[in-house]
Amino acid sequence: MPFTGQDTLKTRRTLTVGDKEYDYFSIEVAEEAGLGDVSRLPFSLKVLLENLLRYEDGGSVTVDDAKALAAWLNTGSSSNEIAFRPARVLMQDFTGVPSVVDLAAMRQAMADMGGDPEKINPLNTCNLVIDHSVTAEFTGTADAMQKNIEKEFASNMERYTFLKWGQTAFSNFTVVPPGAGICHQVNLEFLAKTVWTEEEDGKTIAMPDTIVGTDSHTTMVNALSVLGWGVGGIEAEAVMLGQPVTMLIPEVIGFKLTGKMQEGILATDLVLRVVQMLRNKGVVGKFVEFFGPGLEQLSLPDQATLANMAPEYGATCGFFPIDAGTIKYLELTARSQETIQLVEAYAKAQGLWRDADTPDPQFTDTI
């Protein structure tokens, strides 16, 4: 699957990080090419703009799509549809099994027609985390966890055997086994990279990490500046097979955070208040993006609590920009130094980095 288009606006540039070179599609160059002052876009829309610049092929994505997104600045809204291609798909075992069954059926059909069944593979990276089969039949003893895992394997042996076959049979498809944690936790702590890379024609392409998942709380990873949300199983399969998510360019509500939480106040207290405010505002079908000096006082796990609750306040996602806290969390969770250095360098090159001196973006409305 191609990860780049025809680049009509000539925005492709090279970024050197350490001793490695990455190609990327520059938002700054797009601005110089006549798109307008896109540096004022919300960070979440900059991620969508980069996606359009990278996949612009004159067909499913055109220069007019990028211009329409840039024109969003005029009114803070748009009636234009765009084709968004996420970098990854996240599944859990209940919603993911039917997708693997469909892929297996496609392979069987290919074999029946005399073709090579091994040509049937996900085109985008797909991670399936087995976490929805957890039961707690044993409690209160030192070996309770081990007994529960053994019971889980015994009860779900056919499904787990099938999924293990899927991991060995398909490329771009990995399964995280039972007992590793909840899919959103695994995604945040292990799978997400903030800046994704793919190899194409001997070049390494750097891009924002983006995702759709088959669980509504996929939004949790927006705390790590990974733009994403939950979709249905059919949409997820389509993305696995290289198809875009068609969406209206969303309105973006800015939620300004100031000050810091007092001692004894927890992230759950904060999120309940935020949910109340956003429900009163009405943010269904919209992006929420958090900004303001208060971001520096929130740890990334606390930000993840706010991002996780996007389905409760009705927004498509609750996005946090890349900042020093993002880098600190990537270090805390033992991401590679190569990844951490790339995230900081790429974010600064693309205008996706936020610090105390960064001007506030232009939003549809603010709270």
For the regions a protein language model found, what residue spans apply to each?
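Fe-S-dependent hydro-lyases/dehydratases of central metabolism
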Residues: M1-I367
